[in-house]
């Protein structure tokens, strides 16, 4: 569990961001760190919300920025603490987030660390937990890996989900691309018929 001394030890910006977290969010991180240290499961009693998502995302960004500095003040012990807190924070976000922006942050982080197992885990979370509109947003990302993970997830979506997205002026073209992939890669006749009907309507 991070004591105030430990957090202060990690740098001024980290201490500031930590102090700005709601007590409930700080408690979530503390319990996750304790669970990681003891090998136990964390409690699910905390009501995770969009604000906790944003707070943890900012905290993780501060931790990763500090780790990237590699200054003389960052000795081996402090670096180890920094990595432990950052990895724990990333794990909590990975388990809880449904935000496209946070997902992209986690993928970029795993990519920089060459942690391909974590990227696979994130891809699984994308298909099992994220709303279709968030996946579409990721499919338009400038990050190649994020974009490909999202397009792959959409290509495995049920036709009914993609059909609903066709009514959204922002997501419609992304949904069409997913339907085309279903035709080409999976030989989906249902997707083929839907695309043909769309083409007929537009003639």
Task: Place the predicted regions along the sequence by residue.
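Alpha-helical repeat scaffolds
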Residues: 106, 192-195
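N-terminal "cap/leader" segments of large eukaryotic alpha-helical scaffolds
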Residues: 2-35
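C-terminal end-of-chain micro-motif
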Residues: 1-2, 202-203
